[in-house]
From Swiss-Prot:
Manganese or magnesium. Binds 1 divalent metal ion per monomer in the absence of substrate. May bind a second metal ion after substrate binding. Belongs to the RNase HII family. It holds the Pfam family RNase_HII. It comes from the Bacteria. The keyword Metal-binding applies. It is an enzyme of class 3 (hydrolase). This is Ribonuclease HII. A divalent metal cation binds at residues 38-39, 130.
Amino acid sequence: MKRSASDSPLLFDLPLAPDFSQEQQLMKRGLKHIAGIDEAGRGPLAGPVVAAAVVLDQNDLPEGLDDSKRLTAARREALYEIILTKAITVSVASLSARSIDASDIRKAALEAMRRAVIGLTLKPCHALVDGRDVPPGLPCPGSALVKGDQRSVSIAAASIVAKVTRDRMMIRAGAAHPPYGLEIHAGYATQKHRAAIESEGPVPGLHRYTFAPIKGCFDC
């Protein structure tokens, strides 16, 4: 299906910071509660993929929301607490490395998103999803927004919640598995992480055995 220009924004089309205009367009159609959905952890060699769904209060929007990748860790942590306080409802879901290996990362990420929406205490009227895919099986209609975390404050809020949640999980994993430095790189393929995998081997249940360079290098 051909994508519209709004689905694939050019860099100069993006706002300086995400705003509430995407949500307002839906609200003009009578849709009251709009959920933003995003995930963290598609690319790492280790750990889960984590998705978050957030329904913001249009009358009490947190200030400073942005794509989590454009924020410092300290700023993400501060906004995370503000989002949990101000949002109407927030839900987080994750799929483990084993679940990722059993299917693939795209399917796992979409399933985590679906579960996050289902976990909301209030059923949204519509979901705005970061990326190009709407997860199958959502309990509400959804729209995919390319670079949505830079266009929609609801998606930006979800990106922050997902990122902070996953980073905290990887800090705990790092304490349990010191040689890998997971608390530093969150499971991504840094030189330190790759060297530790080569010397120590991958950890079952933690590392993604279907991801290169792990795939085919070890007896799993």
